[in-house]
């Protein structure tokens, strides 16, 4: 009987050790608070049952929070009330801003941990969100929802830290990552503020009118955050098919066999890749943003810099060197120039722009049917190099020096990136081609 009691006590002790290990994620957590002699006694088969009983009680007392956790009613009740308050206030508005606010709040307050690892950062974030919801009385107004979204955007780094470090269950991690992605996409360019301000009038109130030689100002977002951009690299599972692109469109990931080699992959400069895009002329950016060097060298249209502020053509001083020549000779020169111009126009007639619909529903405009066909083929899974070559469009080979780099804020689908640093994983191909990050900028910093 004494032998059976000792075996039963030893089995209970082993079960307790396994329980503490599984709940904490630390295989040595059960040793906390034990002396070296007690640790040795646990792994010794000849230890008496009385001593094992004392060690067992000591382990359970040390980890009493795992056996007798504090009642979660208060915390869960606060979170439920905060979600209910936010839902009641934001439900008064049928706007994308209000829906995104509610998505982020629900994902944060409903997140659960598998183990205690990383729990402090999650609990702190949840308390801050609960407090923010309680003290706000204007969530039922469009201005209040936008202001609350700016508060949530300020928590992007905290949300990223929770996703990267906390031991979340699968459902919580997926929901929180989807909310983070939507919120991060909304933060780029501060589109909410741009919509509030509306189009700026030329030459009015505080902003001088631009001269003809100046480029139009483009909306820019804050300085790029390498840690934010690199979060997607930390867990390839976050790029699964169930992750929805903000706006309700699901982005399709090309299969590994059809994924083009990364140095020839068209699209925006992706974080962590160090790419310098080379210009493929003739593609207009979604939303009407002009590309650097658009249509440069195509057709006979003069450069914008060839006109002064009144729209008059500016001639080179050398054009006036022969102004004193006889009228007959100048007339002959003009006739020859007209014949050359007519010949050039007859040999290369201008081609009408063509609209291309991408698999995710977005549309881009190409300057020629050939470029449109290349973009459509590449978006359907054809390797980038093959898609462009089939249309007779040459693109730079890997390692080619970029003669006309495009400003990162002005790149679009159809530009070709020539990589000069660490290649990107193939899982990012869908984000690269669909221009999810078409305003990202190359940067250096910590990666996950």
Curated annotation (Swiss-Prot):
It holds the Pfam family DUF4226. It comes from the Bacteria. Residues 243-261 have a biased composition (Low complexity). Residues 187-198, 307-334 have a biased composition (Basic and acidic residues). InterPro entries: DUF4226. Transmembrane segments: none annotated. Residues 187-221, 243-270, 291-361 are annotated as: Disordered. To M.tuberculosis Rv0025 and Rv0739. This is Uncharacterized protein Rv0026.
